[in-house]
């Protein structure tokens, strides 16, 4: 992920008040977001998930204070409503992830990461993900309606298709989405669930038609391997960092702060029980713990989530 995009995401979260709490990065790779965590967020506890074992092990070595699960996101045992924010550059592609909890939605991989992560953050928490423009621009509104019922779109930034050229050698139009989780599901269908047509006849998400200042380039139609498709061409001689900074300044939200349990910096973890599978929950003396490698850390969960986790532990332990 280009540093200029990581900086912009952290700039947005900083102005939303994120200074501490739990921060999640699914598909963390070797930990570029972790490495660029600003000083103002050093009190955050950072959690990562990475499928690739080499990248995941590198991230663990580089960022030993972070908690990194080297496994697929679909297999990571991460509690619901636990994180204050989530960041990342999620995988794009026309592939689907097998995850029993979400299979009924038939999501492509980038939409799966958005939908699942909404369950992992607290009400009021914010997701800041780079995703394929397909999430916002696909004809079917189903994914956007699902997200809108569970989160408020703080804003979206359409990136020029050269944003990843230097780092990945690809010309791809992508978006940064900023979503703030609702405290309950609402039957709502805001404008951004649907598409519209701009003044040049290009069909795209209605949010970008109504907010052209959040499109950091010129939208145009171009021939691709899949036929004609819309692309965001970069402005000539424009500095992407400046454009991003200006766009981010227009994002307005406040991430609520939750009281941290226990004295600051106190390590309440205990040595791992070898009979407890790595990256899974267990109960010790009536208290919930989550095993990460050689330690088990206490976790505080909302009551309904805690009851579900305890039920799963009981079911697991009796089989």
Give a label for each model feature:
Residues 65-73:
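Conserved SAM-binding strand-loop segment of SAM-dependent methyltransferases
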Residues 77-87:
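A short acidic, Gly/Pro-enriched loop at the edge of an enzyme's catalytic core
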Residues 87-91, 130:
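Amphipathic alpha-helical repeat scaffolds
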Residues 166-262:
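Flexible, glycine-/basic-rich loop-and-beta segments that form/coincide
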Residues 1-14, 77, 161, 223-319:
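Non-catalytic, mostly N-terminal accessory regions of nucleic-acid modification and defense proteins
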Residues 1-62:
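Class I S-adenosyl-L-methionine
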Residues 51-53, 106-165, 172-179:
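Conserved Class I SAM-dependent methyltransferase catalytic core
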Residues 20, 82-83, 153, 174:
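Local beta-strand N-terminus motif with an aromatic residue
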